[in-house]
Amino acid sequence: MSRTMQSKRMQNSVAGMPNHSLFLLLPHTRMQFAVFCLLALGNFAYADNIHHVINKLPYDKIKPFPPVQPDCQINEIALQFQPQLHISSGCHPYPAVDAKGYISNGLGVSHTFTDCDGSPEGSQVYGRAYVFKGYLAIMYAWYFPRDYMVTPVWVGHRNAWEHAVLWINDMDDDPKLLAVAAKSMVGYKTYSPPKSKYMDDDSFKLKYKWMVVSHHYLAATKDKGEFQDLIMWDNMTENARISTGPQGWSHYQSPLGDDRFFRALHESYPF
C-alpha cells in the first residue's frame, strides 16, 4: 500500500484526555488528504461529558454506518490492519448505534431460540485511533446483542462489547504491526510480536471464545475469520459518539468513549 505522507512522531503521556497539539505533516503531493482525520488525533474529547436522551431500537433494526473509505492516512492504516473475527459460538457482532444516536436494546438471555447469527441490516466493527507514547494505537471494538454460553446451566447477559488494541510503529511510509493486545477474561493478552500463524497478510486473526462457564473474550487463532464494515470514531456522527459514551448499555459499556478508551491504551500498552 503506497504512502507518501509522513507523520511527526509525538511523545505524550496521555493522562486521560487527548493532546490537541498532535498533527500530521502533509506534503504538497498529498494535499487532497487535507481532511487528514483531525479526528483520530483530535479525537472529540467531549463525548463522556455530554448528556442527552438515548433512544433504543430492537437489536436487529440498527442500521450500520457505511464502511469507512481510505480517504486519509489514519483510515488507510486502520483498513490495512483490520483484524478478522472468527465466531464459533454465541452471537455474531451486530451494529450498536446508528447515525441518529439510537442504540441497540440487545437481546435477553431468556430468548433461547431467538436468532443472533448476524443482523439483516449488516454488521459493523468500530475503530478509534490515537498516537500514544510515539506509537499508533488503533482499537477495534465489536458489539454483541447478548453474551451467552450453553453449559450445564444457561449463563449470560444482555449486551456485550469485546475489543483489541493494535500497536503500530508509526504513520510512516511502511507501517508495521508490532503488537496486539486482546481484551481477555482478566486484563489483556498481548501478542508481541504477532506470530505468523495468527496473521493473514496484514490482518491479525481473533477468535470470539469462552471457557467452561466464562463469558466470551478474544484470543488469537489460526482459523480465518470474517471482516465487518469498519467505521472509525471520527467518521461517526456526533450523536452516535455521544451515545457510545458511559450513558449507553448500563453495566456493559462501550470501550470507545473517552474514559474507557484512554484507560484501555494505558492498560494495553505493551512496550
From Swiss-Prot:
Protein name: NLP effector protein 4
Cellular compartments per GO CC: extracellular region
Transport listed as a keyword: no
Location(s), subcellular: Secreted
Motif interval(s): Conserved heptapeptide motif: 156-162
Domains (record comment): The structure of NLP effectors is remarkably conserved with a high level of conservation of a central region containing the conserved undecapeptide motif AIMYAWYFPKD and heptapeptide motif GHRHDWE.
Function: Secreted effector that acts as a pathogen-associated molecular pattern (PAMP) recognized by the plant immune system. Seems not to induce necrosis in Nicotiana benthamiana leaves but significantly improves disease resistance of Arabidopsis thaliana to Hyaloperonospora arabidopsidis and causes an inhibition of plant growth which is typically associated with enhanced immunity when over-expressed in Arabidopsis.
Sequence similarity: Belongs to the Necrosis inducing protein (NPP1) family.
Sequence motif Conserved undecapeptide motif, residues: 137-147
Signal peptide: 1-47
Induction: Highly expressed at multiple time points in both early and late stages almost the entire host infection process.
Glycosylation sites: N235
Keywords: Glycoprotein, Secreted, Signal, Virulence
